[in-house]
Amino acid sequence: MTATLNTVQDLEASVLAGTAITRDEALSLIDAPLDELSAAADRIRAQMCGDGFDMCSIINAKSGRCPENCTFCAQSIRYPTISVDSYPLITADELVRQAQENKDKGVIRFSIVTSGRKLRRDEVRHICEGVRRIKQEVGIEVCISAGLLSAEDFQALHDAGISRVHCNLETSRAYFPSICISHTFDDKIATLQAARDEGMSLCSGGILGLGESMEDRIDMALSARELGVNSFPVNVLVAIEGTPLAGTEQLRPEEVQRCVAIFRFILPQAAIRLAGGRELLGDDGKACFQSGANSAISGDMLTTTGTTIASDMALVKDLGYTVTLDHSHS
């Protein structure tokens, strides 16, 4: 494909034919008519992924007192004016209880999220115990988001029954030092590669509204494509008082919708997953679910309130989706 094929229709046809969109081609979509762009992204989603909708929920299994300095996060100890619940790892019984509660509501993927740079080895063993019980007693897909874990950690977690690892890139490689300097973009990449090498599927996306450019957002998605991510979460910044990003101007819903549509061109087969901040869009993400997004994190987030699982189930059904695991869930 040549760079002259830069219309929405030409790029749609190229993506559907199996050609990977280039960076310049993705950049050309920034100024495309939104309605045309969204409709094309939805057609790509329908042809490449079908009408399945992957609904997951998360549990804040260890909260607060994180030593890292991510500028958007309320759980960092670097920002002492923020009041956030802090507690150690919850019990295996509580993990099982919450997994069952979410499964009963129709959720098909349950992610265990912990604060901190990474889990200690004894904490990994504790999580493994809970996961084995969840797989035996509940029967639900289990994911983990536990920081910069090692290959040895991933082997133990995979053996226990965890199928997917989440570790957000957050933004582009170029912009990453603007939001965090206590760890690096390459630390993230190494973590995801270690999980992939262990045979686990990858969930990695980022946050819109950190002050990044559209080019940064596209570069983030291209990095995710290079990693072969199966799920690409799209968060919208909830600017929390007390963090360095407090007072940041909120993105317009149309800008988020445009980003989601462009992400679908870049990641035609991934589950593009609306995540934190969806309540800021005004329609709980409906326009984005018609612009290439085909999955969501439902319920409350880590330190912010989300949409209800029941309302999400009704919304995606009305849009013609069927709740099911994304096609690349292994």
From Swiss-Prot:
Co-factor binding comment? Binds 1 [4Fe-4S] cluster. The cluster is coordinated with 3 cysteines and an exchangeable S-adenosyl-L-methionine.
- Write out the GO biological process terms: biotin biosynthetic process
EC numbers on record: 2.8.1.6
Answer whether the UniProt record assigns the keyword Repressor to this protein: no
GO MF entries: 2 iron, 2 sulfur cluster binding; 4 iron, 4 sulfur cluster binding; biotin synthase activity; iron ion binding
PROSITE patterns per the record?
Answer: RADICAL_SAM
Keywords, comma-separated and alphabetical: 2Fe-2S, 4Fe-4S, Biotin biosynthesis, Iron, Iron-sulfur, Metal-binding, S-adenosyl-L-methionine, Transferase
Question: Which residue intervals define the domain Radical SAM core in the entry?
Answer: 48-278
Write down the chemical reaction(s) this protein catalyses.
Answer: (4R,5S)-dethiobiotin + (sulfur carrier)-SH + 2 reduced [2Fe-2S]-[ferredoxin] + 2 S-adenosyl-L-methionine = (sulfur carrier)-H + biotin + 2 5'-deoxyadenosine + 2 L-methionine + 2 oxidized [2Fe-2S]-[ferredoxin]
Binding-site list for [4Fe-4S] cluster: 66, 70, 73
Record: residues binding [2Fe-2S] cluster: 111, 143, 203, 273
InterPro entries named among the record's database cross-references: Aldolase_TIM, BATS_dom, Biotin_synth/BioAB, Biotin_synthase, Elp3/MiaA/NifB-like_rSAM, rSAM
Q: What class of enzyme is it?
A: transferase
**Oligomeric form and interacting partners:** Homodimer.
Similarity comment text for this entry: Belongs to the radical SAM superfamily. Biotin synthase family.
The identity of this protein, by name, is: Biotin synthase 2
- The species is Corynebacterium diphtheriae (strain ATCC 700971 / NCTC 13129 / Biotype gravis)
The taxonomic lineage of its organism, from the top, reads:
Bacteria, Bacillati, Actinomycetota, Actinomycetes, Mycobacteriales
